[in-house]
């Protein structure tokens, strides 16, 4: 048999063995926007980008979208307009994003606390609470100076207070995932497993 003879026999069979398995496995997870919620430093943006890549979905970061809409950074919005103005802009931006085709959306730590936003997310998307120990989150956020809520303060104290205030709202997320101090792709696999179980 010549090389030319072999090509028609083997090539058509190779693709169906792999592609449909991946497609069928992940297709249900692509049907709705996946919204990541949780405290600052838990990895919503970094893990979210990788999750979007695995699913073949666009990635959106609500904080970046708020900055683009306001024409200034989150820190500037907090300093010049105050937190209430930021939260109002955040709510409107998330509502707009939820009307877009399915994507992975990373939200700010306080977004899901807003009852209106929380209800809208749970209605139009799949909400995923990423959770990790406060001490771990404090170590992460202390490495950067771009978090207005912890700048110049004890991050453990701030995050502990935020956890007490926000966890009841986060608990209303449809999927809960403990991420811990793991590589980003391990967290992605944990999210995918939890999403599959939720769709089962």
Curated annotation (Swiss-Prot):
Pathway: Metabolic intermediate biosynthesis; chorismate biosynthesis; chorismate from D-erythrose 4-phosphate and phosphoenolpyruvate: step 5/7. One of its GO terms (cellular component) is cytosol. Keywords: Amino-acid biosynthesis, Aromatic amino acid biosynthesis, ATP-binding, Cytoplasm, Kinase, Magnesium, Metal-binding, Nucleotide-binding, Transferase. Its cofactor is Mg(2+). Its main location: cytoplasm. Gene3D superfamilies: P-loop containing nucleotide triphosphate hydrolases. ATP binds at residues 41-46, 147. It catalyses: shikimate + ATP = 3-phosphoshikimate + ADP + H(+). Signal peptide: none annotated. GO terms for biological process: amino acid biosynthetic process; aromatic amino acid family biosynthetic process; chorismate biosynthetic process. Mg(2+) binds at residue 45. Its EC number is 2.7.1.71. Substrate binds at residues 63, 87, 109, 166. The keyword Nucleotide-binding applies. Binds 1 Mg(2+) ion per subunit. InterPro entries: P-loop_NTPase (IPR027417), Shikimate/glucono_kinase (IPR031322), Shikimate_kinase/TSH1 (IPR000623), Shikimate_kinase_CS (IPR023000). NCBIfam families: PRK13946.1 (NF010552). Catalyzes the specific phosphorylation of the 3-hydroxyl group of shikimic acid using ATP as a cosubstrate. This is Shikimate kinase. The lineage of its organism: Bacteria, Pseudomonadati, Pseudomonadota, Alphaproteobacteria, Caulobacterales.
């Amino acid at each position: 048999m010549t090389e030319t003879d072999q090509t028609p026999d083997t090539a058509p069979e190779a693709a169906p063995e792999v592609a449909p398995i991946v497609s069928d496995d992940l297709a249900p997870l692509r049907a709705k926007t996946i919204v990541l919620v949780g405290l600052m430093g838990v990895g919503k943006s970094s893990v979210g980008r990788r999750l979007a890549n695995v699913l073949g979905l666009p990635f959106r970061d609500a904080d970046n979208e708020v900055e683009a809409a306001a024409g200034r950074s989150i820190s500037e919005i907090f300093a010049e307009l105050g937190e209430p103005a930021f939260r109002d802009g955040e709510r409107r931006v998330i509502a707009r994003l939820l009307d877009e085709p399915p994507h992975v959306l990373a939200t700010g730590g306080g977004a899901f606390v807003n009852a209106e936003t929380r209800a809208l997310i749970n209605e139009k998307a799949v909400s995923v609470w990423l959770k990790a120990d406060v001490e771990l989150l404090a170590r992460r956020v202390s490495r950067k100076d771009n978090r207005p809520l912890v700048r110049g303060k004890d991050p453990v104290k701030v995050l502990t207070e935020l956890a007490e205030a926000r966890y009841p709202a986060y608990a209303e997320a449809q999927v809960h995932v403990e991420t811990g101090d793991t590589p980003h792709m391990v967290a992605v696999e944990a999210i995918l497993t939890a999403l599959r179980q939720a769709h089962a």
